[in-house]
Amino acid sequence: MTVIDEQEALKRRLAELKTEHRDLDIAIDALINSGNYNNLQLQRLKKRKLVLKDYIFLTENALLPDIIA
């Protein structure tokens, strides 16, 4: 796999992560607005959303070139 292929794979993965993060945000809002949820269910969704945020951060950093100042 070339560097360009790796970059493209990272970009695709980043798009997938952002989509899943956005979908979880919508799901959490819908769950809260429904008023019919338990706290454990909500906590699991929020934890998953935080994990995705970390993966997004790591993937974005992997896409940035290393610049030595």
Regions found by a protein language model. Give the residues of each.
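Amphipathic, hydrophobic secondary-structure cores in small proteins
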Residues: E8-A69
